[in-house]
Amino acid sequence: MSVGKYLTIIALIVIYISETKANPYQMQWMAYPHPDDTAQVWFRNSYEIAERPVTARITIASTGYFELYVNERNVTGDVLTPLRERCSANAIAVTYDVTRFMRAGTNTVAVWYSPSFPHPESRQIALSFYGRAGDGSPEVFDNNSSWLCRKAVNSLSTEGHELLGMAETEPKWNAEDIDVARWLPARIVGDNECVPIEHRSRMYEATRISRIRQQKYFDIEGDSVVYDFGEAFVGLVRVTLRDAVKGQNMRIGDMRYVCSGEADEQAIQRFTTTDCRRLLISGDENFDNAQIQKVEALETETYTRDMKE
């Protein structure tokens, strides 16, 4: 055998091993140490990388919904990721090319997780982070023992609707330079039970925002305001507020929102959808309909995503 062929075989073996390590079926599951039925969870980890990798990919599996961030940039792209059947908790993995978000030095990977419906889940996310160095050699960046987590400001109600907390209480949860004193080590699921994972890597069905529109008209009914969109929609609701009181409670359809008290703020669903034509907004004793600056319906649609585009 020639030296060239020998080196080629060795290179192929190295590539195979690196890809095997990054195989989503071999990823280790993790969860908040004390999972409950309704909590959304933030996960984060920091990686020290001497040189910016030539390529970098993250394969993330989840039994619920997630948003993936690298250095504060949302790399997920779609909404309600991954697309799944209602009230399902099967494990689904998606692979993302995160090369353009990488840098030399500290790289922070963060995940916002939500259960797909109210239920306790011992396996929440699993993640594999890998790529290639400047010399072409494979790199696996995983360090499961360093993952931290804490409950997010949002959660689900027992009926499966979204409860939005005050975002200003942790505005930079996915950034590098935050105080992690109140964060806990993620619980690594150590059993050997095989969990089937549906892996979506090239072309798959996903959900995106297809149209944004405002109401046709609104009516003031007592202490509430009803916004009529003319025709029913399925998607997210986004409400822009001004001069709300910090801690003020609002009901926006089935969604609950606690105001941050900033001059301008937005309440928007993240992991649930609304299906309606008329949207009722009300609040506590501090609520004033003049606080509502804009109400928008962000209609969603299912499409085929091509990760090679």
Predicted regions located by residue number:
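N-terminal secretory signal peptides that target proteins for export/translocation
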Residues: 1-2
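Sec-dependent N-terminal signal peptides
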Residues: 6-15
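Bacterial Sec-dependent signal peptides at the C-terminal "C-region" and cleavage site
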Residues: 14-26
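Extracellular/oxidizing-compartment recognition motifs
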Residues: 23-309
